[in-house]
Amino acid sequence: MSGFLIANALLFLIVTAYAVYLFVYLVKTRLAYIKLGQKEQFDQRFKERLHAIWVNVFGQKKLLKDKKSGIIHVMFFYGFILVQFGAIDFIIKGLAPGRNLSLGPVYPAFTFFQEIVTFLILIAVGWAFYRRYIEKLVRLKRGFKAGLVLIFIGGLMLTVLLGNGMNLIWHEHGLSWSEPIASGIAFMLSGVGKTGAAVIFYIAWWIHLLFLLSFLVYVPQSKHAHLIAGPANVFFNRMESAGKLEKIDFTDETKESYGAGKIEDFRQSQLLDLYACVECGRCTNMCPATGTGKMLSPMDLILRLRDHLTEKGAAVTSRSPWVPAAAFRHTRGNQLAAASAGSGSQEAAAALDYNPSLIGDVITEEEIWACTTCRNCEDQCPVMNEHVDKIIDLRRYLVLTEGKMDSDAQRAMTSIERQGNPWGLNRKERENWRDEAPDAEIPTVKEMKKEGKEFEYLFWVGSMGSYDNRSQKIAISFAKLLNHAGVSFAILGNKEKNSGDTPRRLGNEFLFQELAEKNISEFEKNDVKKIVTIDPHAYNLFKNEYPDFGFEGEVYHHTEVLAELVKNGKLRPQHPLHETITFHDSCYLGRYNEVYDPPREILKAIPGVQLVEMERSRETGMCCGAGGGLMWMEEETGNRINVARTEQALAVNPSVISSGCPYCLTMLGDGTKAKEAEDQVKTYDVVELLAQSVLGADLKMGEKQ
């Protein structure tokens, strides 16, 4: 037996060492691929980053947003960590028969706990198999590769239970309460005898070891690389406000292009995202573009970028992405690596001719322009991948480097550049909306200065509030409520320009920066300390992105100011409305800035209002379809996003659909018309409803919206 044990131990060391070598090689290879990206500075905010690890890795916070899948993953995650101690115990039993993990009197409790955890993991494997292959959850991939990890995990659990059962027979330990499942197996197979039990034990032991080491090697070259890249991605995730876009330095004369025209143009942290992807499909499941039949799928976008990085990385670094190399010699990645190293077959040399373009071959322009930048994908991602900034970088390349843009979007850009608004209307008519409210005091900054008066808030009206007839009513209602509450404010009037959100989200960073600098100059010239706006897109820009260009000041959304005025009694809702209202969360107010409660607090304060929530609300609220500059583009593929969102609102039988965004309100109003429901269901901004309750203002509930 001693000779066998020596041979067994030597073989164990050789196989384990080879597996560890392959694992390290694969991790270093992926790291080399990631390093092809653009370097970036690390802010060293370790405390916050460790907190993110605690919450999202160990706390599984994002995974538990989907309770069913989340619970399965929690069982896998903690179960797999815990059973590693059992695996060590099992390996010791094979290397030194009769020995085990030295835990003294607590060993029986340890083995009992291990068996319970092992059993729960087997249940989780069965549940996961059911969800993927029988229930056929749409967002989950099927096929052999998708189920291979279930085979690995299930095999590991079954072999350790079988091996422990045989160990009881082999060493005549007898049945034990501390190993109930192994004891059951031992009881059923008691007829095999000691020798037979020893043989079966080592068969199970080696299968277990090979499963374990194969899984170790499989992880870095599969979607399960997220076990390594996921926690790293959470740790290195940007600590800035959600969805904040990187500033382009146009003064850098070394730059030959802007945006991402090739995979190496992405930042290293963006490339880390690609290997962190779990392929869970949660992003795609929530994407408004995917849900309405567009080509864009956030998960597929990440996976195609990942595969492209792997192949490009193999060609550049000469490091084969797949091991054992002999088994994967026919894959493009290994052929590219071999050809790059000057070795390999004719097929490997021919592989060098494969040079797909990032935009066109890997990701299509149609996909790039389908994104509404709503960030529902990012909010759902358990490893904190950022999809939107990659799409914006691709847009930046198309717009700034190649001069490509959708014709409708280009018209809006030209109009903004020439007249400061997307319609190309006269910039000198920007403040004319005040004429629609002769009973309200809506002074310009210039007028306030002329009278020697000061103002607390700069009311940023925005292009919609200034020029769009429907949105002007929102601006007027807000101004009247500020007058009623005694809040001093002023507008820039004709000095106001477009905030720059549309150009920036469409990829025209140059125009955005030009607008931002001019707006900030106007703020500074007029000593602006506080800004309030009815436009969530401008709100997000001023609050989170203008500071990169030198702006310092407080920024508020109008619902935040109104909620506070209601709370402190300066605005008293008194006229009942008797309406059933559902509230639509603007993406740039909600997911980007986590402003969910103020608009709801306002609606709840209005007498007679019954607030009902849509199935998708707050963090999971669906986009109206206007974000990302798509307000100015036609949807030519699939169903209209605004109609899909309107259908979700109509499903809860409201009499009013409310929002806190003029863009959303326009899209939802068009949606009710498309569903021929505009006579039964009206669309109003929160401020209009509050104005009716506080001032008794007649909103003409039956008028055409």
Swiss-Prot record:
Identify the cofactor(s).
[4Fe-4S] cluster
Record's note on what induces expression: Repressed by FadR in the absence of LCFAs (fatty acids of 14-20 carbon atoms). When LCFAs are present in the medium, they are converted to long-chain acyl-CoAs, which antagonize FadR as to its binding to FadR boxes on target DNA and thus derepress transcription.
Predominant place of localization:
membrane
Task: Name its cellular compartments.
Answer: Cell membrane
Question: EC annotation?
Answer: 1.-.-.-
In the bilayer, the protein is annotated as: Multi-pass membrane protein
Instruction: Please report the stretch or stretches of sequence annotated as the 4Fe-4S ferredoxin-type domain.
Output: 268-298, 360-391
What keywords would UniProt list here?
4Fe-4S, Cell membrane, Iron, Iron-sulfur, Membrane, Metal-binding, Oxidoreductase, Repeat, Transmembrane, Transmembrane helix
Membrane-spanning intervals of the chain: 4-24, 71-91, 109-129, 146-166, 173-193, 199-219
Q: Name one GO cellular component term.
A: plasma membrane
Does the keyword Cell membrane feature in the UniProt annotation?
yes
Disulfide feature: none
Q: InterPro entries, alphabetically?
A: 4Fe4S_Fe-S-bd, 4Fe4S_Fe_S_CS, Cys_rich_dom, HdrC_iron-sulfur_subunit, Helical_ferredxn, NarG-like_sf
Q: Does the keyword Membrane apply?
A: yes
- Top-rank taxon: Bacteria
Residues noted as binding [4Fe-4S] cluster 1 in the record, renumbered to the chain: 277, 280, 283, 381
A molecular function (GO) held by this record is:
oxidoreductase activity
Cofactor binding remark:
Binds 2 [4Fe-4S] clusters.
* Residues holding [4Fe-4S] cluster 2: 287, 371, 374, 377
Q: What is this protein called?
A: Probable iron-sulfur-binding oxidoreductase FadF
